[in-house]
Amino acid sequence: MREEIRKYADEAFEIVTQAADEIGPRLPGSDNERKFHEVMKDKMNGLGLKVKQEKFLVAPRASIGGIPYAGWVGIAGAIMLNFTQLYWLAAIMLTAMWVWLVCSVFLYKTWFDWCFHHEVSYNTYGELTPEDGEYDYTIMLSGHTDTSWNWKHSAIKSKLNPAFAFIKVGLGAVCVIVTTALAWTLAISQYVDYITWMFVAEAYPIVCPFLVAGSFLVTLWLDKNEKTASPGAMDNATGIALAYIVTKYFKENPDKMPKRCRIIDLNCGAEEAGLRGSIAFVRKHKGEDILKNCYNLNLDSIADEDYFEVVRGDAWQGTKFDPELIKMFEESMKEAGIEKPGNIVNPVGGCDSTPFHKAGVRTVTFAAQDPVMTNYYHTFYDTPDRFSVETVGTGLDVILRVIDKIAAVEDGKRNETPVETPAETPEETPAEVHAEAPAEAV
């Protein structure tokens, strides 16, 4: 970390500590999420930014927050298959659950949000413009204010590998899949294949307890208790703090502000509910100036000093982020002294870059997080005492270097644009004037 930015790194870490220790868990649409928005809005106003806050409705349990529902549906379906009259109902119910699970939890579609309870969340953003108000492009620094429910299977303090959580949930998922397959087998075979139906129906009471027990593991994936939810020091108070601090850095150092550039500090709500804040933002501002010639640098979880990485896409969402920005981050991480900068595809879920990418905005996500399962990711143990101000400062260093590279690209574009000048009128020679003058009357 460069010494000139140390005081900014210290302030960023103070914001992280305030968010995690004083405000605490900030579930999507919760009062604490709103408190954090108000804290950051006050800070933006204190810088003299042009601040706006936009409300939107969110169904916290319609996406990842609703995973336990899949387990309960699996349990209900497994029990219903003990009764011939309920075969078809169980099959249809389980299939409907899978349609919702794939669309809402895996693909982050909003199609079924109307089926769930809603809360109010917010997007808060502040604009820093050049002194003359003239700009050609926008650099938008985004992060999410909310935190995740506590993932009970991985929230362990023992030496047991937290990846065991995936084994437990995987076993549960297999049980729900088997229950669904048996439901359709029993429903159809009772009419077309009596022997198969008799065999499965007689064996089912033996299998049923195992299916119920396995499905129960899925219900334990998230703890709905807000008090035990993640305090979100890493994920994502770090991103929010750094987005603000970068903006403050340029406000206090106008000589280092990129020329003809607008800086926006965007605090997205409800990311943990399926990217609902960033989705709401790009939908609201579709076709508007704020998304034109815009570079979105999404900052998410910058805490693990050995795992600085640029996220080049979301596998489940089928998105690939801007290659030019990816290259800039790779170069900037090396310049900042990071020995092994990472370049990864987000293997599960999604990040706020995805809605921006789908809206046609150049975007990439920057992180410093161990990409494998840990006992602090989305758990009660995501606290600020786990990482250092040095790591946050290194992240700040990288971001500032990337912004310098973006500015260089935009400056180059302006210099390449030819300036049209009016054609000069050639001066007339005395001979031409004499020749064109009318003859005087005698």
Predicted segments, located by residue:
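Core alpha-helical transmembrane segments of integral membrane proteins
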Residues: 66-107
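Canonical alpha-helical transmembrane segments of integral membrane proteins
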Residues: 66-82, 168-187
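Long, low-complexity, intrinsically disordered segments
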Residues: 423-442
